[in-house]
Amino acid sequence: MHKILEKRQLSYDKERDQSVFYYKVQAPEIARNRKAGQFIIFQIDDNYGERIPLTIADANAEEGWIAIVFQTVGATTRRFSVNFNEGDNVPVLVGPLGKPTHIEKKDGAVLCIGGGIGIAPLHPIVQANHAIGNKVITVIGARTKDLLFFEDEMRKASDELIVVTDDGSYRRKAVVTEPLKEVCEREKVSEIVSIGPAIMMKFCVAAARPFGVPITTSLNTIMIDGTGMCGCCRVKVGNETKFVCVDGPEFNGYEVDFDNMMQRMTAFKDKEREADHKCRIGLDAGKKA
């Protein structure tokens, strides 16, 4: 069992009725062994239920905890946010999984770009690059001010932090591809790391292409076992089929088929809606009677 040490709500999206939560969870072995870019899979039931992959957003090996950040986009994440609080135990927590981010000393800057919930998995990559002395320029963005989080954490680990919102409600009105282009134009950038919604990463790749800067994207697909057996997380990368859970989650952005990935991620939307549905047959009729 893994005890929840801290629970915080980071943001709430009124338009979509979705929240972002931060959980600090006791997990000594994972905290000792994890590296930037790796993820865990959790379940809220011992034997049944959906398995949710989440990149580790932070960790402390000495204190034995990891931090996970998730958005309440479906039935399982909603149940997790409502039913699990500080002092409770997460029944199943497996990790660290996936290949870690390749961190090395660069001649130029490392440009790290996070959008929406993608800000959370970007955080340890920013930290790791900062720790070895790379110049880190970080861009974080969201649709509106209320959906931003980790600003202070990112500023602490970055040489420069650029914050943008789609509607201009906080800091600069822009989408993340605009500062991407500006930074690449003004100085030497050795690598770009982009994490966020698939459509955002697709446009970041398109914006980076004219500059010829290597770009790494971290993919968050549907997963079940996390070992490559089920094939649910397969994506097209170059001319090959890759499994996000074992080959990733990070891939060369220029080679990822984002259109195919986005299509596959809609495969279970109908089932997700059914999971949230509450049958009221007979109940409403009884009220009318």
Q: Which sequence ranges carry the predicted segments?
A:
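Ferredoxin-reductase
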Residues: 1-88
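Short Fe-S-cluster ligation motifs
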Residues: 243-247, 251-289
